[in-house]
């Protein structure tokens, strides 16, 4: 698969822009609908847990993708992804507590944290039939989804795990203990695949980063960071421009990472994007979700950066793991469930002044050039075609 991807990359550098009918690589994964609306008593009413965690958003993978990705892991089994459920001294098991334990790990995606928490539910379950186990998992899944109703990844991770429980016919012919063991193994394996996906994306993107180029980055994406770390480790000379990313100033954090790597970096105020775009060769962004249209949901400001880049004929590259593909089809910005964040202007704001607090926006596919995923290099139209076919 990777040799095909490499050929695709080299052709891109010598030929006109990609045709929408470019031959596809392995089909993207599918995802169940996200953003359910149960009441959430554990999060602040005005600030979403999405903003508080700043976690990446993920979706559902197929069993074929799991088999393919497992082979790519090359035997790596990080100890940080294996954990026995706490004895608790008789304390009732809490799926939210287990989820929070995994969510706090810096390199673990939020969807994988949900998978690990649901795997722990299986370990603690005293169910004697698959039906009883499914009921317990459904209740735990709904509890996790209600923790933050705006999180695409959280809902997707729960849907992923439930998919394996309800759609795997092989488990019907096994005793409950064997079935539990197999489901637990799948959850742990998915955690390993999550880390491997970023390394694969970093490898695929290297042919697009050339010596002397200037890259504009918006937000703090762990995938984009891995891409640039790999390029720097490979001896490539490039410069990075980071937007400040107000109000949470993710650009400051990203610029510090670049400085640690001895990569020349310039920090921009958000309003200086158009001013600086003329000296930029490409734009690299991550994604909280890749939707059916081929567009992306990402940190607020991504849309306007893509608009400026498009008007000045600069390529916009998206680095996103394939399990972020979401079965969503926003038509405009208002179709997104708001993920609110606190904003401090440094001065008192009159009560009559309305403040926009949304943390993310939607970028349509026509403003994106390519998506780098662990399945290969995809055009936005390929994402759209595959997701539509998967859910017909």
Model segments located where?
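Long amphipathic alpha-helical segments
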Residues: 35-181
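Gly/Ser/Thr-rich loops at beta-strand to alpha-helix junctions
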Residues: 214-225, 247
């Amino acid at each position: 698969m990777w040799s095909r991807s490499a050929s695709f990359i080299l052709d891109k550098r010598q030929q006109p822009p990609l045709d929408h009918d470019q031959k596809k690589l392995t089909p993207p994964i599918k995802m169940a609908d996200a953003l359910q609306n149960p009441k959430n008593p554990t999060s602040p009413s005005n600030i979403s847990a999405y903003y508080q965690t700043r976690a990446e958003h993920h979706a559902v993978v197929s069993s074929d993708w799991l088999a393919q990705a497992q082979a790519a892991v090359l035997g790596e089994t990080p100890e940080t992804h294996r954990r026995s459920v706490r004895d608790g001294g008789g304390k009732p098991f809490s799926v939210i507590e287990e989820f929070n334990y995994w969510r706090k790990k810096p390199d673990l995606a939020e969807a994988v944290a949900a998978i690990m928490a649901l795997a722990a539910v299986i370990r603690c379950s005293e169910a004697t039939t698959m039906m009883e186990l499914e009921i317990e998992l459904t209740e735990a899944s709904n509890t996790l989804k209600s923790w933050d109703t705006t999180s695409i990844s959280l809902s997707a991770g729960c849907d992923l795990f439930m998919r394996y429980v309800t759609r795997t016919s092989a488990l019907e012919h096994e005793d409950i203990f064997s079935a539990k063991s197999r489901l637990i193994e799948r959850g742990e394996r998915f955690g390993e695949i999550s880390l491997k996906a970023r390394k694969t994306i970093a490898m695929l993107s290297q042919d697009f980063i050339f010596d002397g180029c200037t890259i504009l980055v918006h937000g703090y994406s762990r995938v984009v960071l891995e891409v640039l770390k790999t390029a720097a480790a490979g001896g490539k000379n490039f410069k990075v421009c980071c937007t400040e990313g107000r109000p949470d100033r993710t650009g400051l954090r990203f610029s510090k990472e670049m400085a640690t790597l001895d990569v020349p970096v310039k920090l921009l105020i958000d309003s200086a994007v158009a001013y600086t775009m003329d000296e930029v060769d490409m734009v690299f962004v991550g994604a909280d979700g890749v939707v059916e249209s081929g567009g992306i949901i990402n940190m607020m400001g991504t849309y306007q950066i893509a608009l400026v880049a498009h008007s000045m004929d600069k390529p916009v590259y998206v680095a996103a793991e394939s399990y972020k593909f979401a079965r969503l089809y926003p038509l405009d910005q208002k179709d997104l469930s708001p993920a609110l964040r606190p904003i401090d202007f440094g001065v008192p704001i009159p009560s009559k002044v309305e403040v926009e607090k949304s943390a993310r926006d939607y970028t349509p596919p026509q403003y994106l050039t390519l998506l780098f995923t662990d399945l290969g290099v995809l055009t936005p139209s390929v994402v759209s075609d595959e997701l539509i076919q998967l859910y017909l």
